[in-house]
């Protein structure tokens, strides 16, 4: 009977006592901005920052504790810029950008998460669930030609907000052998209230290969969706951000 009992996750080839990921996420980025007045709730226009590819730096650290539990830390940053011609007037934070003029936009986002994990599994498979918290910061700046007193002039508007939110994670890891593994991971952040609210979903699947015992590579494909609501005293902004693409990591395990 003892020979048939499942192993603790800590005995699994799918997990490491210490695991480090350093790399980048080559993401196709789409940013949609919906501006409106705060009271009454009236739309003042929508604009899509031109879609493009961006490299998102990313770092992770996994620590296994007591064989069946662990800590996970994740941090990444995104910077997306575009220049486009407005097809219709667009008012953002009170700045009335004119149609048929150039609009320059820059969106920056950074997120850091920490989660406590519980792992279950056997010699080759590990299933995990985690709870934790996330800190994220978003910046948006728009520059272009605005209409003021029947005259045109250069103008810009920007905001910079941050927030803390709860985090939920799930994961499955499978080891084909000691040097080749497959994994699927997902996480969700939800935040209501405050100047910057919204939610973030992140999912990814990848393969790890260790030609040396402690050093290897990981390649994955991921998709991230952010919906952020920025509430100001007079004007609000809703942002819908979509990222998807491959990632490559240098892997270190101990």
Feature-to-residue mapping (PLM):
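Extracellular/periplasm-exposed beta-strand and loop segments of Gram-negative cell-envelope proteins
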Residues: 30-56, 77-110, 136-163, 191-195, ...
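Short glycine/proline- and aromatic-enriched beta-strand/turn motifs that initiate or cap beta-hairpins
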Residues: 10-80, 247, 251-253
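N-terminal signal peptide c-region/cleavage motif recognized by signal peptidases
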Residues: 4-9
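Repeated loop/turn-to-beta-strand initiation elements of outer-membrane beta-barrel proteins
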Residues: 68-71, 124-127, 178-182, 213-217
């Amino acid at each position: 009977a003892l020979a048939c009992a499942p192993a603790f996750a800590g005995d699994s080839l799918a997990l490491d006592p210490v695991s480090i990921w350093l790399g980048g996420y080559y993401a196709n980025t789409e940013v949609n901005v919906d501006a409106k007045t705060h009271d009454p709730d009236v739309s003042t226009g929508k604009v899509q920052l031109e879609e493009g590819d961006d490299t998102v730096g990313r770092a992770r650290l996994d620590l296994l504790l007591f064989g069946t539990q662990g800590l996970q830390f994740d941090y990444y940053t995104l910077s997306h810029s575009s220049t486009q011609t407005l097809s219709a007037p667009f008012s953002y934070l009170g700045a009335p950008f004119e149609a048929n003029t150039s609009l320059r936009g820059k969106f920056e986002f950074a997120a850091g998460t920490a989660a406590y994990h519980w792992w279950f599994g056997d010699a080759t498979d590990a299933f995990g669930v985690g709870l934790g918290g996330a800190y994220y910061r978003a910046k948006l700046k728009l520059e272009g030609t605005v209409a003021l007193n029947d005259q045109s002039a250069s103008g810009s508007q920007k905001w910079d907000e941050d927030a803390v939110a709860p985090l939920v994670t799930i994961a499955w890891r499978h080891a084909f052998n000691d040097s080749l593994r497959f994994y699927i991971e997902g996480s969700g952040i939800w935040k209501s209230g405050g100047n910057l609210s919204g939610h973030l979903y992140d999912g990814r699947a990848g393969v790890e290969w260790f030609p040396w015992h402690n050093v290897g590579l990981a390649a994955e494909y991921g998709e991230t969706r952010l919906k952020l609501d920025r509430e100001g005293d007079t004007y609000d902004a809703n942002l819908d951000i979509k990222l998807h693409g491959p990632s490559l990591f240098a892997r270190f395990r101990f």
